[in-house]
């Protein structure tokens, strides 16, 4: 059966993404000084105000107010008429240390307690919380990501680029994109059905002018030729006007764009957000590891599509469960594939941190346009360095 599937993205000026970037900018500043910092920072942004709250345990000192203001200004909220201005907005902070009850399990995992510290080094740090995390990959795009979320991100990035480079000078920072793709009976993308762009703009711009310039400077340069058609339904600012935007129009919160951050709704999500969390939080690090495994499995040709779920208990280093699904696309025995994954990939938090080199100030740039499918050497979970090892396990 043919079906339509839709995914969305948002620009860096979207209120929730402003909050995510502030939280991750604070994390980067702390982890740059203290790689072992324990950080869980949440941000709220609204008209003229940014509120930062959370738990931090560290020897580092950072100027949170300065980080907040610089992040807002870098995004593009530089003028009071936007309703939110990094120079003049209020900044309120409420930061305290990590709960000692949580620290008991993170600082010394259950496995280390049971072995009286004589065990494996990677058994020493426990998961910072319970929960389940998902990783996914598909061979339908070069990014090993679903086509709808890839195109939605590319449109959002292009929308921001033409604003910042003043190619379209009347755009403002807030914006959203959405792409609907038709899939064939065998799950292959066939064509783009609908493209939706909502772009904040200056008040003197007409809707027809906006449609014309976005088609010329954003949509056509972004959509691959193989998917372009004059039959694509294109919607631009369907309400007819988008002048009021950003935090002055909608309150933004850290962690409210978890589907944008991951796979565009193509697979389940455990619910845990990424931004503002140091890598001992498996909400972040285990998601990255799961993506790493999934991408390498598909790139190795072991399946056309692959999903992995991993679950944790707070204070315990080793996952409590691991499940895989190839959606009937596996080229090898699935039970053996699961065994090989367990043998080759270590999902304990400290092992993930070491493997992916996560104790670095790399997180602010993950906080907009998706954590996965990005061509950036700092996104170590996108590496394909396990492909050959996986192939050898199956004598390929």
UniProtKB/Swiss-Prot annotation:
Annotated region (Flexible loop), positions in chain: 98-108
Per the record's keyword annotation, is Zinc included, yes or no? no
Q: Which reaction does it catalyse?
A: L-methionine + ATP + H2O = S-adenosyl-L-methionine + phosphate + diphosphate
Q: Which residues form a coiled coil?
A: none
Name of the protein in its database record: S-adenosylmethionine synthase
Q: State where Mg(2+) binds.
A: 16
Q: Which residues bind K(+)?
A: 42
Q: How does it assemble?
A: Homotetramer; dimer of dimers.
> One biological-process term from Gene Ontology?
one-carbon metabolic process
Cellular location(s)? Cytoplasm
Q: What does this protein do?
A: Catalyzes the formation of S-adenosylmethionine (AdoMet) from methionine and ATP. The overall synthetic reaction is composed of two sequential steps, AdoMet formation and the subsequent tripolyphosphate hydrolysis which occurs prior to release of AdoMet from the enzyme.
GO function term, MF aspect, one:
ATP binding
One Gene Ontology term, aspect cellular component: cytoplasm
Q: Which UniProt keywords apply?
A: ATP-binding, Cytoplasm, Magnesium, Metal-binding, Nucleotide-binding, One-carbon metabolism, Potassium, Transferase
UniProt binding sites for L-methionine = 55, 98, 250, 281
């Amino acid at each position: 059966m043919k079906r339509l599937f839709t995914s969305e993205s948002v620009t860096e000026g979207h209120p929730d993404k402003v909050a995510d970037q502030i939280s991750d900018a604070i994390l980067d500043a702390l982890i740059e000084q203290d790689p072992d910092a324990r950080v869980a920072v949440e941000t709220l942004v609204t008209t003229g105000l940014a509120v930062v709250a959370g738990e931090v345990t560290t020897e580092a000192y950072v100027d949170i107010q300065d980080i907040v203001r610089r992040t807002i200004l870098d995004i593009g909220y530089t003028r009071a008429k936007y309703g939110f201005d990094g120079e003049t907005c209020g900044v309120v902070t409420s930061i305290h240390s990590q709960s000692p009850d949580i620290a008991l399990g993170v600082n010394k995992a259950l496995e280390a307690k049971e072995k009286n510290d004589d065990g494996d080094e990677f058994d020493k740090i426990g998961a910072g919380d319970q929960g389940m995390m998902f990783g996914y990959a598909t061979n339908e795009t070069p990014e090993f990501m679903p086509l709808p979320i890839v195109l939605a991100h590319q449109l959002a990035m292009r929308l921001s680029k033409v604003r910042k480079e003043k190619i379209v000078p009347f755009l403002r920072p807030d914006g959203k994109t959405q792409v609907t793709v038709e899939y064939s009976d065998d799950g292959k993308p066939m064509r783009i059905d609908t493209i939706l762009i909502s772009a904040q703009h200056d008040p003197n711009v007409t809707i027809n002018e906006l449609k014309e310039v976005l088609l010329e400077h954003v949509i056509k340069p972004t959509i691959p030729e193989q998917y372009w058609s004059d039959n694509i339904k294109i919607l631009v600012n369907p309400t007819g006007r988008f002048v009021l935007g950003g935090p002055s129009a909608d309150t933004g919160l850290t962690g409210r764009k978890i589907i944008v951050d991951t796979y565009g709704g193509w697979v389940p999500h455990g619910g845990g957000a990424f931004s503002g969390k140091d890598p001992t939080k498996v909400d972040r690090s285990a998601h990255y590891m799961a993506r790493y495994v999934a991408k390498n499995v598909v790139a190795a040709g072991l399946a056309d599509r692959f999903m992995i779920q991993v679950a944790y208990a707070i204070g315990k280093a080793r996952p409590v469960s691991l499940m895989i699904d190839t959606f009937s696309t596996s080229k090898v025995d699935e039970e053996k594939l699961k065994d090989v994954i367990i043998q080759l990939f270590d999902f304990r938090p400290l092992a993930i941190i070491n493997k992916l080199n996560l104790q670095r100030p790399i997180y602010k740039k993950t906080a907009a346009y998706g954590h996965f499918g990005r061509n950036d050497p700092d996104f170590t979970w996108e590496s394909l360095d396990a492909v050959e090892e996986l192939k050898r396990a199956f004598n390929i």
